[in-house]
Swiss-Prot record:
One of its GO terms (biological process) is protein folding. Pfam families: GrpE (PF01025). This is Protein GrpE. The keyword Ubl conjugation does not apply. It comes from Pseudomonas savastanoi pv. phaseolicola (strain 1448A / Race 6) (Pseudomonas syringae pv. phaseolicola (strain 1448A / Race 6)). It is found in: Cytoplasm. InterPro entries: GrpE, GrpE_coiled_coil, GrpE_head. Coiled coil: none annotated. Its main location: cytoplasm. Residues 1-23 are annotated as: Disordered. The gene is grpE. GO terms for molecular function: adenyl-nucleotide exchange factor activity; protein homodimerization activity; protein-folding chaperone binding; unfolded protein binding. NCBIfam families: PRK14139.1, PRK14140.1, PRK14150.1, PRK14151.1. Belongs to the GrpE family. The lineage of its organism: Bacteria, Pseudomonadati, Pseudomonadota, Gammaproteobacteria, Pseudomonadales. Residues 7-23 have a biased composition (Low complexity).
Length: 187
C-alpha cells in the first residue's frame, strides 16, 4: 500500500511537473513573440528616424542651393538692361567708347559673379525649341532652318543650379505654308 501511495504521489508530481512544463513553454512562446514584436518596432522606429534625418539634410541642402533664387531673379532685369544698352549703342562711336567699355566691364563682372553661384544663361539661338526652357513669343515661317528651331532670342533665360529661374523668350520657326495660286495661275 505504501508502494501504491508512492506511485500515486509520483504520478501526481509528474502530472504537476508536466502541467508546469506546458505552462512554462507557453510563457516562453509568449515572451518570444513579444520580444520579436519589440525588435520589429525598434527597427521601424530606427528606419523612420533615419528617413527624417535624411529629409532634413536634403531640405537644408536645397535651402542652401536655392537661397539665392529670389535675389538672382531681381538681378536679371539689370543684366538685361546692360545687354540692351550695349546692343543699342554704336561700337564705332568714339564719343561713347569709354562709357561702352565701362558697361561691358560691369556686365562681365555681373556675369562672372552669377556664374560663380551656378546661375547660368540660356541663349538658345539656333537650337531646337524646348518648352521646358523656352517661352515662344511668336512663330515665323522659315525655309532656312528646320521647323521648331529658335530664330531669335528676345530675352535670355536663366537657370540656378539646374533649376529654371526664367525661361528664354524666343521666336520659333515653322514650315513655310504652301503658296496659294494667284488669279493668273488659276485662269
Amino acid at each position: 500500500m505504501a508502494d501504491e501511495q508512492n506511485l500515486d504521489a509520483q504520478a501526481q508530481d509528474q502530472a504537476a511537473e508536466a502541467g508546469a512544463g506546458e505552462e512554462l513553454t507557453t510563457r516562453v512562446q509568449v515572451l518570444e513573440e513579444q520580444l520579436a514584436a519589440a525588435q520589429d518596432q525598434s527597427l521601424r522606429v530606427a528606419a523612420d528616424l533615419q528617413n527624417v534625418r535624411r529629409r532634413a539634410e536634403q531640405d537644408v541642402e536645397k535651402a542652401h542651393k536655392f537661397a539665392l533664387e529670389k535675389f538672382a531673379g531681381d538681378l536679371l532685369p539689370i543684366i538685361d538692361s546692360l545687354e540692351r544698352g550695349l546692343d543699342l549703342s554704336n561700337p564705332d562711336d568714339e564719343s561713347i567708347r569709354p562709357m561702352r567699355e565701362g558697361i561691358e566691364l560691369t556686365l562681365k563682372m555681373f556675369q562672372d559673379t552669377l556664374k560663380r553661384y551656378q546661375l547660368e544663361a540660356i541663349d538658345p539661338y539656333g537650337q531646337p525649341f524646348s518648352a521646358d526652357q523656352h517661352q515662344a513669343m511668336a512663330m515665323q515661317e522659315s525655309a532656312d532652318v528646320e521647323p521648331n528651331t529658335v530664330l531669335k532670342v528676345f530675352q535670355k533665360g536663366y537657370q540656378l543650379n539646374g533649376r529654371l529661374l526664367r525661361p528664354a523668350m524666343v521666336v520659333v520657326s515653322k514650315a513655310p505654308s504652301p503658296a496659294t495660286p494667284s488669279i493668273n495661275e488659276q485662269a
